[in-house]
Amino acid sequence: MTTDVLHVAAAVIRDGNGRILITQRAKHAHQGGLWEFPGGKLEAGETPQQALVRELREEVGIEVKTAQPLIKVRHDYGDRRVLLDVWSVNEFDGEAWGCEGQALQWIAPQQLSDFAFPAANLPIIKAALLPSYYGILEGNSVEQVLTRCQQFLQAGVSLIQLRLKSLPIENRQAVAEQVLAICQHRSVTLLLNSDLQLADVQGDGVHLSSRALQSCQQRPEGLVGASCHTLEELRLAEKLALDFAVLAPIQPTSTHPDAKPLGWQPMRALIEQVNLPVYALGGLRLADLDQALANGAQGLAGISTFLMENSQ
């Protein structure tokens, strides 16, 4: 087993139609014949972003205009250890082509599961399929929940967790049915909190509370996230092959005034120890998105984060 780590910069590149660019590794290369996200190893003295710009120019002939951090993945193949520094690239000049003779394809995100990728790429696929915003839907009344749901949609939230801890039990079933109908109409992904006991309401998956995560023996079906507060919980979410985790609290929050906030650097240190997309939660506003991404988060999660009066 080698102790050297190969540091690679790679990109999830999207075109104007939302399609993702993938390329095929040469047959003679490590993990040959498999598909991957374009990129390559860092040269001496390069930053990951500098390497990304150079590699995409050399490999697929495009000039990167903007790039945002997506996820870092550490993987040990036995004969090779890699650190994949992955970025989202949505703005670029030029038309992609296989400069090194490699096959490439533009595919819809949902087609990623149809292609064979190296094992280290699997967390990247999870991150590529997730948005930057994760709304947690709560409210004290039916009207408040539905109003907040509409505000989430106006803020561009396309992934919602229905929690409803503050709503009277007798109202939860009816509200859940209404929210599900709204989400289906707007093509928004809806996860049900694991503590909700509802009949005949099937969302797109489940969000495990930290308590439910601790007792989980097998990954539930559908899209699955989990609430985490410690490295141990993050590692458990990773072990269960969940799609993502939510780490909290990052900043001081009025809803949990006694909870000690992690802060950005400790959050980053925790996230870098797991190969899993992780949303930042707690005391955050929309203006914190760039800070969250720069510190390794998938994006922002929140209740009040996406409400108009608190989003700036």
List each model region and its residues.
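NUDIX/MutT-family hydrolases
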Residues: V86-S88, A96-L129
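Active-site mouth loops of central-metabolism enzymes
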Residues: L130-Q144, L223-C228
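Alpha-helix-loop-beta-strand connector modules within alpha/beta enzyme cores
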Residues: Q173-S194, S210-L213, Q218-T230, D258-R285
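Conserved Nudix-box catalytic region and its N-terminal flanking loop in Nudix hydrolases
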Residues: R19-E59, L70-I71
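Conserved N-terminal beta-strand and adjoining loop/helix that marks the start
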Residues: M1-I20, K72
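Catalytic cores of alpha/beta
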Residues: R148, L190-G205, H229-A241, I271-A280, ...
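Active-site-adjacent beta-strand/loop module that shapes the phosphate/pyrophosphate-binding cleft
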Residues: V73-A96
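Glycine-rich phosphate-binding active-site loops on the catalytic face of alpha/beta enzymes
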Residues: L164, S210-Q218, F244-D258, G283-Q312
